[in-house]
Amino acid sequence: MLVVGNRIVDVSRHTSIGTIVIATVDKLAPGLGIAFVSWTHGQGKGGLPSTKKHYGILPLRSWRGRGPLDFATTHELTGENLILQHGDFVLVQIVQDGNHAKVHLVSGHIALTTSRLVVWPGLSSKDWIFSHQIGQKINNYLHVRKLVSYMRRDQILCTGPQRWMKEQYALEHQWENFVLEFIEQPTGISYLTSMTEKFVSPVCAEWFQHPLSVWIIGCNLQIRESMTKWMITHVPHKSRHIEITTLDAWKNWYNLHRAAIVQPQIPLRSGGTMIIEFTEIGWSFDINSGIGLEIGSKTCANEEAIYAIAQQILLRSMHGFILIDFIGDIDLEKLRVNLIQFTSLLEQDSYHIRIISISADGLVCVIRHRRSKLI
């Protein structure tokens, strides 16, 4: 469950890779802080352990703003607040009362459990990152392994690793996911450019050993230019087929997660099917031929899938990485003609697309390689 304002969004598909919370007191009103919820046993009569559960909160940033865990007094939460679970992060109001500080939950901002996500408005690339396991500041985001992020103009959603690795290990080729953030603030551009060179490049180098279909929608122009420059330098020309305009179009990202359970398999008139899946890296479209589908019908299925994918992108407000697995050996020249029509269709709805690479037979290897790493 993800709480954005008063709206609850289901992002349970991200629970397998842990939780990262990004928050900062500087962006919050005076007296507000971020708190960590821990489970404790209370004491009953005669000092015996009570069977009733109590929940305490440990503010990660104090009202003085000195740093994490400098205000670690545990506070008992009662009443309806008991819906909280161990590991939750909450937004709290910290009120000075003489030599003590009282902590109150801010209604409507109960955030997450240890396997959930949280969104705080108004964040920038300079904000603090907290892990529910460590609760410490991570410098420059560079210690984070398997970080996948999505960002709107005023909100950010992050998923993170089960464990942290030191920077020197993260810089090696052990990365299992693309690392990408959508950030519009100027402060984030230089960081993301360097991150592309350090982290995305080694992953791309391994992936682009095979022809690969990757559609990138909804990213910052400067970041996209940086990745394109790297591709021209490092990626074999045979793996780069089509280059189209970059984009700066943002949709409601929470539709991405809710759409993952809506019509996952779409029948095609040609007799094939298209399976849609939301993975840790983005959306994947798997076009299947079905039983007894002839070669000519396979070509029709691939062409039909192009327009079906365009329809799904518009319907589900997709952005980010979109991976497409076509059927068998197809005519790439004919496919390119269809792709031009496809991009024109999406651009009519304010989408701008960059197609990094398109191929008929290389994507399956990439998807299987990624899944085998994540299992």
Swiss-Prot record:
One of its GO terms (biological process) is rRNA processing. The keyword ATP-binding does not apply. Involved in intercistronic processing of primary transcripts from chloroplast operons. The endonucleolytic activity of the enzyme depends on the number of phosphates at the 5' end, is inhibited by structured RNA, and preferentially cleaves A/U-rich sequences. It is found in: Plastid, Chloroplast stroma. Binds 1 Mg(2+) ion per subunit. GO terms for molecular function: endonuclease activity; metal ion binding; RNA binding; RNA nuclease activity. Mg(2+) binds at residues 286, 325. It comes from Nephroselmis olivacea. One of its GO terms (cellular component) is chloroplast stroma. Signal peptide: none annotated. Keywords: Chloroplast, Endonuclease, Hydrolase, Magnesium, Metal-binding, mRNA processing, Nuclease, Plastid, RNA-binding. It holds the Pfam family RNase_E_G. Its cofactor is Mg(2+). This is Ribonuclease E/G-like protein. Its EC number is 3.1.26.-. PANTHER family: RIBONUCLEASE, RIBONUCLEASE E_G-LIKE PROTEIN, CHLOROPLASTIC.
